[in-house]
Amino acid sequence: MGPRILIHADLGRVEWRDSLPSCQRLAELIGWELVIVRRQAGDLMHRWETRWERNVARYATLECVQVILPWSTPSMRFCTSEAKTKVIASALAKRFPGQPILNVTGIRREESATRRAKPVCAIDSNLATGRREALVWNPIIEWPIEQVWRTIAAAGLTHEAYAVYGSTRVSCVFCIMSSIGDLRAAASCPDNHDIYRAMVDLEARSTFAFQGNRWLADTAPHLLDADMRRAVTRARLAAHERMRLEALLPRHLLYVKGWPTTVPSDEDAELLASIRRRVSALLGIDADYLTGPAVRERYRDLIAAKPERIAVP
């Protein structure tokens, strides 16, 4: 039997304040070392903020045709892959070089359709290499939620998210997968008010709701001052207009894997330029390529720069 550790990926401001102490209580109870890892480039809120800044810059230089949202989504969960999975795998690989690793998780089939299909045990693709065997083991995958609650309560390891505030799950305080009830539960905790306001501010600046069509701002509007409520109202209107305008874009003007596939006609280029002018004004983006000829020239330049050249008319 090799060394055993607990490992926790700290997500920073978006995490429940009781999450790290809960891990520490568990480590003390079972007598294992607790290893805490963090994304070196910044916490998850920083990731969303910088993603938005970069997406604005990409739109300004016509590196993308439509404005790209700042948030993670259920189909694009870089929050999990970058802030949890990768940093945990990296820490384990450095700590146990060349040694076999058994990675034990607490996922359960009841949690989602994806997890319902997970095996009890499998090769851990994030850790396994030609020189290292690695398995991921999901020992409680069949457990119903009631058994989870009983086990936690018996160990005296309850978490404030559900014990105090009534959340049905412990994740980021405001998670892209959260129900409206869990979002409200998180907002009822005073510790979460600052991050709530920061996330609503990003909704307002970006014109993208946190969960598709569900605005986080609607969860606890009483926590927002008058200026922020007005900013959210403007953002909703701008979002509706942005989506209406972008729906006018012909599909052949959209990029495929980040690259244009054809140079637009004069008519299409003028249409795209017109949409870019209006969207840029809505979002306050200082964009280039706002005339038809400039758009055509930009497409030509990008096509010329693409590794596999496309015939330019």
List the predicted regions and their residue ranges.
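Nucleotide-activated chemistry modules centered on ATP-dependent adenylation/adenylyltransferase
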Residues: 1-313
